[in-house]
A protein has these predicted regions:
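Positively charged n-region of N-terminal signal peptides that target proteins for export
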Residues: 1-4, 20
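Extracellular/surface-associated beta-sandwich interaction domains
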Residues: 2, 26, 34, 207, ...
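Sec-dependent signal peptide hydrophobic core
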Residues: 5-10
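Compositionally biased, low-complexity linear motifs
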Residues: 173, 305-309, 361-369
Length: 385
């Protein structure tokens, strides 16, 4: 089952006398659940409302991994789907929300309350001839974010380039309006606008289902069955693990043609893959060494690493495990190949435990087990000599 993260967005509108440019602020009344300020007024403005569906998994606020909403900051777009617009430009009504910052509050226990997303108060334009689709992405990038470079909007595509160190949990989602009947008759309503919520039969607040775009790897170290200590001054340590993956990725947030929505690919201009060290925090500091002799059971190495997957063709990851005996010993790298049973592919939105069993300086056993985000089968054991 794919785990999605939902937040609810009510369409927005302005009074009919207002212009058809991007949404603006306007005082609101009590309104109904879809944001219509005065349901008895056929020309009532419709407020943009943001909320979130319920999730039951806790998340540590300091980590990049998102399992539930907890003051999570996302970027939101509302863009015209109409064929009249070949691209989205300021001033022509095709952009309702552009990289709008939204905060999904959540609850202390990790569950989510409705209307938990906070943005500046916005309304739809008063005319009803433009139909919008909503898009969201995480982590948010803008002038007031850690990443100050916002997404680009060029040639009918909104894209964001992420430079990653393994801590970034990149997510994306969209909400496309379902065709519904007009209470007054005539053509069905197709696309979020003021009329959709004023006159739509059974109009529902838009849901954006965020999905993880990367694969999560969790490294664990343990003693192999044949492990024996060489003495207190020759304790064996795993000092570093490197994954061969892509350090820069391009996420398509919105594509006017509709073919690339949500796609994530390596950045062409950066080049190929690189060896990225397993880290211990969002700052990108290398994970602390683990002394194998002292392990009782297993020991986590670093923190969760989010890495790119090519989908069906990503059946392996190459990595290096660095070993050192004693404080003055030579550091030796041991290449490993991480793979799943039956050559299954590593999937976005899934979490895998990579269990490394150390026998000696030149013998490492590896297996990977799928956990957390989505459950799945265990991976086959691999022994590297």
């Amino acid at each position: 089952m794919k785990k999605n993260f939902l937040f609810v967005m009510a369409a927005a509108a302005m009074l009919a006398s207002c212009s058809k440019d991007a949404a603006v602020s306007e005082p609101a009344g009590t309104g109904n659940e879809n944001g219509v300020v005065d349901p008895t007024d056929p020309n009532s403005p419709v407020l943009v409302r943001l909320g979130a569906g319920g999730l039951g998994v806790d998340v540590t606020p300091t980590r990049g991994v998102v399992d539930s909403w907890n003051n999570t900051v996302v970027g939101i777009y509302a863009l015209a789907k109409d064929a009249d617009f070949t691209e989205w430009q300021a001033g022509d009504g095709s952009i309702l929300l552009e990289n709008e910052k939204g905060t999904i509050t959540g609850n202390p226990d990790g569950s989510v309350i409705k209307d938990a997303i906070t943005i500046a108060e916005k309304y739809y334009p008063g005319n009803n001839d433009i139909h919008y689709t909503f898009y969201g992405y995480y982590p948010y990038a803008g002038a007031d974010a850690d990443d100050t470079t916002p997404p680009t909007n060029e040639n009918g595509k909104v894209t964001k380039t992420f430079t990653i160190n393994g801590s970034q949990d990149i997510m994306w989602g969209q909400a496309v309006a379902t065709k519904i009947n007009n209470k007054d008759g005539g053509e069905q309503l197709d696309g979020y606008n003021a009329l959709y919520f004023r006159k739509g039969q059974d109009a529902a607040t838009p849901d954006i289902a965020f999905e993880h775009k990367l694969t999560q790897l969790n490294f664990k170290i343990k003693k192999a069955g044949e492990f024996s200590t060489a003495g207190p001054d020759k304790q064996l340590s795993v000092t570093k693990i490197e994954i061969n993956t892509f350090p820069s990725l391009d996420l398509t947030i919105a594509d006017k043609a509709g073919t690339d929505n949500g796609n994530i690919v390596p950045t062409d201009a950066i080049g190929g893959a690189a060896d990225i060290p397993v880290i211990k925090n969002d700052a990108g500091d290398d994970a602390d060494a683990v002394i194998v002799d002292n392990i009782d059971g297993e020991s986590a190495f670093g923190t969760s690493m989010m890495v790119y997957t090519a989908g069906e063709t990503q059946t392996t990851y190459s990595a290096k495990v660095y070993l050192k005996m004693g404080t003055d010993g030579e550091e030796v790298s041991s290449p490993i190949t991480i793979k799943l049973a039956e050559d299954a592919a590593f999937e976005a939105g899934k979490s895998y435990n990579v269990n490394i069993a150390v026998n000696s300086m030149m013998k490492v056993e590896v297996n990977a087990t799928l956990t957390k985000w989505q459950p799945g089968d265990d991976a086959e054991d691999i022994e590297i000599n």
